[in-house]
Amino acid sequence: MFYKNDQIAGFDDSIWQAMEQEDKRQQDHVELIASENYTSARVMQAQGSQLTNKYAEGYPGKRYYGGCEHVDVIEQLAIDRAKELFGADYANVQPHSGSQANAAVFMALLKPGETVLGMSLAHGGHLTHGSKVSFSGKIYNAVQYGLNEATGEIDYEEVERLAKEHQPKMIIAGFSAYSRVVDWQRFRDIADSIGAWLFVDMAHVAGLVAAGLYPNPVPIADVVTTTTHKTLRGPRGGLILAKQNDELAKKLNSAVFPAGQGGPLMHVIAAKAICFKEALGEGYVEYQQQVIDNAREMAKTFQTRGYNVVSGGTDNHLFLLDLIDKGITGKDADAALGRANITVNKNSVPNDPQSPFVTSGLRIGTPAITSRGFGLEEAAALTGWICDVLDDISNEQVIDDVRSKVLDLCEKNPVYR
């Protein structure tokens, strides 16, 4: 028998201690990983609710289990809010992750062995855009495009050339480490010229799109996927969106369930619905604008200190720092900044001589620091401290001094007030 007041503490102290330590880490560290953010307490409340008990295979009104009348309401609210938020005619809120949402798109639109054209992981793409270590590169014939070496921006002429040469059945637009606005219409035109599907993965910029601060691909692409965390600031999960197309909707639904997943996670779907409502509410546009402003301030400050920002700046929430000319690896920079309580992630840069396990760059993003209240002043100061560490990366005294400043900044700006 279970009781409502049962607690982890005192029952499983090993797990509780790790949870408490992670809570302290989040409070005492500055989070600059572009794919991470903080959810609201409301989102966490839904994820820790009794909804986790309910199996609900199928879709609202068409379940394989009884007792789904209330979770049907929840899932339909999530669907309706997602469609309103992104101007879509179709939404599937069941994917457990962005990668599973992407896998469903592949399954719905392609046959094994057919050709896809996506951005190279080494140039800012994602594993599921055709990497050889992913299902997308193992099951399908993946061709990869990259960035223009001179500008650090997508080489659309290369995309067009590769599309004509390889005749892919699907072109993928989207990224995991690209700081500029993507020309969705240019991709549409290229796809149309060869009769290919256009699939957009907007996982990183979905929050900016929802706020109207980044071009919306939904009216342009055949299918759009996103995660529900990152800039969208919701629970970890996936989402598929599309325009009106009944045949395509049927294929996508079948690719999610039963082809790719079994029962949906109703506690996560409830959290998604709450996240969408938050994104439709007051203050959301201002938050996303501050995310962009903070990223631009950081990129500008890095450049002032003599650091190379790929593409020369940013139009969204992230940018890549190229450390090749500094003689520093991304791995060493990541570790040194971690000791200063600044969390980043090492990242490959275009034409990186290092392996993906070492890299020559850092990916830096501002969604999380903006969620805890950082503005331009804090963003500039933080960037200066990062430069101090990287300028003298073996100096532990400098790292200790920066760590003290970071702790003070974090204390003044708690994650949850």
From Swiss-Prot:
Annotated binding of (6S)-5,6,7,8-tetrahydrofolate, by residue: 121, 125-127, 355-357
A GO CC term attached to the entry: cytosol
Gene3D superfamilies xref list: Aspartate Aminotransferase, domain 1, Type I PLP-dependent aspartate aminotransferase-like (Major domain)
Modified residues (N6-(pyridoxal phosphate)lysine): 230
Oligomeric form and interacting partners: Homodimer.
Family annotation (PANTHER family): SERINE HYDROXYMETHYLTRANSFERASE
Descriptive protein name: Serine hydroxymethyltransferase 2
Organism, as annotated: Colwellia psychrerythraea (strain 34H / ATCC BAA-681) (Vibrio psychroerythus)
